[in-house]
């Protein structure tokens, strides 16, 4: 990617080059233009894939109401610090309401969401969400579109804003601050973001999610 650093006169070309660079370094799947609902379903699918034991989910995927139990727990978290503890807590508890799962129906089940010991191994999944769609807290503002998110096991933990060559990196920082001000990262799956990255072909800044 560095060889082409002077050639990124268009932001999209920079985004594509960064995507290929990530794919060459362990990230293994690209999701294009996902909505929040699609990312929640993607997370649900990964949780199911990582919890197929008979005493967990077996052969029965999470129902919409079971995934809502997970999201309700996410939405109860009020700070990035607490969210980090949630993610690194390795598992989440739900009460099975899928009647087809006669083994676990009506029981509390603990589901693995992330294991720090499985970084780059085990059941870890590394995905790139390109140009995710955001809903603002105020419907009058309309929807927004980010540049890139990095997902670990379906959880969007890194948000990246890009600017082309000869645009100051502060403009990407401003874009992130604007999204924060508009409440995009306040609730739902996007509230799981831990790190913001502002990036041009010439410069990169990153900082922890400071919360509201």
Residue ranges and their predicted role:
Residues 1-212:
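An alpha-helical interface "stripe"
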């Amino acid at each position: 990617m560095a060889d082409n650093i002077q050639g990124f006169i268009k932001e999209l070309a920079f985004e594509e080059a960064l995507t290929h660079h990530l794919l060459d370094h362990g990230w293994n799947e690209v999701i294009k233009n996902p909505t929040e609902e699609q990312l929640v379903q993607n997370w649900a699918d990964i949780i199911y894939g990582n919890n197929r034991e008979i005493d967990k989910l077996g052969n029965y995927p999470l129902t919409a109401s079971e995934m809502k139990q997970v999201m309700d727990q996410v939405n109860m978290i009020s700070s990035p610090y607490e969210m980090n503890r949630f993610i690194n807590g390795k598992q989440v508890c739900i009460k099975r309401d899928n009647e087809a799962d006669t083994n676990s129906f009506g029981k509390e089940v603990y589901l693995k969401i992330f294991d720090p010991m499985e970084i780059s191994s085990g059941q870890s999944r590394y995905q790139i969400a390109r140009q995710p769609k955001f809903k603002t807290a105020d419907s009058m503002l309309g929807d927004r579109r980010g540049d890139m998110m990095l997902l670990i096991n379906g959880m969007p933990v890194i948000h990246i804003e890009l600017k082309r060559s000869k645009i100051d990196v502060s403009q990407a920082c401003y874009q992130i601050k604007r999204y924060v001000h508009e409440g995009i990262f306040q609730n739902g799956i996007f509230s799981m973001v831990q790190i913001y990255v502002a990036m041009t072909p010439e410069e990169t800044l990153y900082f922890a999610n400071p919360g509201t």
